[in-house]
Amino acid sequence: MTISAPPIIDIRQAGLESSIPDQVVEGLTKEVKTLPALLFYSTKGIQHWNRHSHAADFYPRHEELCILKAEASKMAASIAQDSLVIDMGSASMDKVILLLEALEEQKKSITYYALDLSYSELASNFQAIPVDRFHYVRFAALHGTFDDGLHWLQNAPDIRNRPRCILLFGLTIGNFSRDNAASFLRNIAQSALSTSPTQSSIIVSLDSCKLPTKILRAYTADGVVPFALASLSYANSLFHPKGDRKIFNEEDWYFHSEWNHALGRHEASLITQSKDIQLGAPLETVIVRRDEKIRFGCSYKYDKAERDQLFHSAGLEDAAVWTAPDCDVAFYQLRLRLN
C-alpha cells in the first residue's frame, strides 16, 4: 500500500519576498541599523540554522530534547482529543516527533500542522516522517508566516470549532522583545484559543539561563557563521535576481555575538571586517562604519519574575510546567486567563 505524502497548504496572503527588500531598506537607513529576521530564513539559511542548532554546545536544543524524552507523555495527556496541533515554525522535526509519538500511543485523534516559510524544507521534513506508523495522528503542512497561520486558524471554516494546541518550541518567543513577545502571545490567544478556551492551549519553551559563558558558547557554535552570512546572498538575490549586482560582498562581513546583561538577552550582529563599507545599489548612499553593528537577532532569557510578567501581559496563565534536572529550558502550557 502506498502512503501518500501529507498535503502542503499554501496559506500565504501576500508576496512575502516582495516585502523583505522594503524591510531591508527600512532597517539599514535607520540610525541603529538592523536586518529583518525573515532575511535569515531562506531555505539555505534554515539548513545552516539546523546544523548550528545540532552543535554540541547549543544547549537549548539538547535541553528541549531531554525534557521531551522524559515528559512527552504528560504533554500529550494535556492535549484534548480532536485537537489541531499547530507547530509555529517547525524547522527540524526531531523534537516534535517525540510528542506526536506520545499522542499516537495514547490514541489521540489529532491533526498536526507544521508551519514554515520554506516549502522545500516542509517537503523534506515530511519525507523523513514514518507516516505509515501513525493511525490516530494525521499530518499536514502550512506554507506561510506566523501571521498567515493565525489568519488561517481564524478563517478556515472546517476547523473553526476544534480545540487548538499551538506549539512554540525552539525558544521562538525569545526572539521577540519582551513587549512584542507579550503582544504576540496575546494575538495567538485571541486568534487561536478563544473558540474553545478550556480545551485549547499554547505550549512554549523559554530559557532562564543568564550565564554569559554558557550562552556565548551556544550562540557561536558551529554553523552560525554561514547561517548569518547566507542572509547577505539572499538579500542580493532579492534585490538583483539576475545576479549582475550586489548590495553586500559576503567576504566583507563578520558575525558578532555578545551578551547584554542589562537587557537579559543575547545579541547577534553583522560587522565589517576592517573598514567602512559602502553598500551597493539601491542602498549606495548607506555607509556602514567599521565599529558599527547591524543587529539581526536577539534571544531574550526569562527569570521567574519576567515569565510571570510575560504571561500576565498576554492574558494567559501557566497550567503546567515541564523541565528536567540541570536544564535552564522549560516548557510551559498556557491557557487563557478567564477571570
From Swiss-Prot:
Functional summary from the UniProt entry: 4-dimethylallyltryptophan N-methyltransferase; part of the gene cluster that mediates the biosynthesis of fumiclavanine C, a fungal ergot alkaloid. DmaW catalyzes the first step of ergot alkaloid biosynthesis by condensing dimethylallyl diphosphate (DMAP) and tryptophan to form 4-dimethylallyl-L-tryptophan. The second step is catalyzed by the methyltransferase easF that methylates 4-dimethylallyl-L-tryptophan in the presence of S-adenosyl-L-methionine, resulting in the formation of 4-dimethylallyl-L-abrine.
EC number: 2.1.1.261
Induction: The expression of the ergot alkaloid synthesis cluster which leads to the synthesis of fumigaclavines is positively regulated by the brlA and stuA transcription factors.
Any one Gene Ontology BP term: ergot alkaloid biosynthetic process
Practical applications according to UniProt: Ergot alkaloids are known for their toxic effects on humans who consume contaminated grains or livestock that graze on grasses harboring ergot alkaloid-producing fungi. Due to their strong affinity for monoamine neurotransmitter receptors they may also have clinical uses such as treatment of migraines, Parkinson's disease and cerebrovascular insufficiency.
Pathway where it operates: Alkaloid biosynthesis; ergot alkaloid biosynthesis
NCBIfam families referenced in this protein's UniProt entry, alphabetically: methyl_EasF
Family per similarity comment: Belongs to the methyltransferase superfamily.
Transmembrane segments: none
Xref: InterPro entries: EgtD_Methyltrsf_superfamily, MeTrfase_dom, MeTrfase_EgtD-like, SAM-dependent_MTases_sf, SAM_MeTrfase_EasF-type_put
Protein name per UniProt: 4-dimethylallyltryptophan N-methyltransferase easF
GO MF annotations, alphabetized: methyltransferase activity; protein homodimerization activity
Keywords: Alkaloid metabolism, Methyltransferase, S-adenosyl-L-methionine, Transferase
Subunit (UniProt): Homodimer.
Originating gene: easF
Pfam families found in the cross-reference section: Methyltransf_33 (PF10017)
Source domain of life: Eukaryota
Catalytic activity, as annotated: 4-(3-methylbut-2-enyl)-L-tryptophan + S-adenosyl-L-methionine = 4-(3-methylbut-2-enyl)-L-abrine + S-adenosyl-L-homocysteine + H(+)
